Amino acid sequence: MSELTKEFTDQLYANYQASVKFAALENAITHNGIHAALETRKSAVENTPVFSLDLTKDKVTDQKASGRCWMFAALNTFRHKMIASFQLEDFELSQAHTFFWDKYEKSNWFLEQIIATADQDLTSRKVAFLLQTPQQDGGQWDMVVSLFEKYGVVPKSVYPESISSSNSRELNTYLNKLLRQDAQILRELLASGADQATVQSKKEELLQEIFNFLVMSLGLPPRTFSFSYRDKDNNFHTESGLTPQSFYKKYVDLQLEDYVSVINAPTADKPYGQSYTVEMLGNVVGSREVRYLNVPMERLKELAIAQMKAGETVWFGSDVGQVSNRKAGILATDVYDFEAGMDIQLTQDKAGRLDYAESLMTHAMVLTGVDLDEAGRSLKWKVENSWGCLLYTSPSP
């Protein structure tokens, strides 16, 4: 191995101090920070929030201090449809309701994975992976569809937010503490030679404890409820005796089994035109698996535009923190000029960023509009985020 010598460091000092530009940038960045010093005027001027296709101006929802973006994004696509269909001024579906059942299902998913890997050492990569984070707030499109199909949805007024749904840190801490303890109980039971029926009975006992914990933290989800609202013309509507499943079927009315996650992952190990899944990723045991269809970026954009032209907003995920100006509400590769501003060359392409862990999907949002040129190609996208509204420039192929 090659150590860093004093002579080499002396040369670095000399090279840096020989540049007048570096001294000016050092003053600007140390006083203002990297983003504030390198923010480009050009990006703000060119990326005005005006779109040739704009599907909604509904109020923006807020996930607060939780990782529920994927739920908010999916429920927002439903609420856009419901607001338009039923002529509502504003409306929200309960994100906390979906959150409750996700925590419940993820707990069972984790315990089933623990049972399935009971013959492996605690130091095995799979068991270590499971125990590192037994469950967390995040998820994928197929996971939220599994929840909707099994548990339905309810209006937010029927099952409102709680402290633990809006700020999930404490809930996750104690739920993971319980699940790791339960993992030890089940592994030791299996190691003692217990039969499947005994293990299943113990798991159900543990799930009752988890259910009780979730109810005390989030509230008891309703089995039946009434739904009343006034439309934009002030006409009153009401319906009683609804269940979460009947409400979902009647008021959402989307065939979610017809939808699939389409991704652009231009890595050598993932040829286009094929679907992929991730081992040990899911929430509802016995439901649809998480799957992604890999396509070129231009095809992905064509599909998103076609869906919006058909009047439907689009659930999507991205690496939201890469190049974003949250104050301006702009996400664009030219929002900061790192290369000229710091004399740094960022040449790694998307495949390289994915392969070398520089990028991954971190956040789900909703495409609600797009600005098209005369040839129908996207210039920029209107994005509804559960932090606020954003503008995305169109990604290159």
Give the location of each predicted region:
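Glycine- and acidic
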Residues: D54-K64, L130, N283-V290, Q348-G352
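Conserved small/polar residues in nucleotide/adenosyl-binding loops
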Residues: Y392-P397
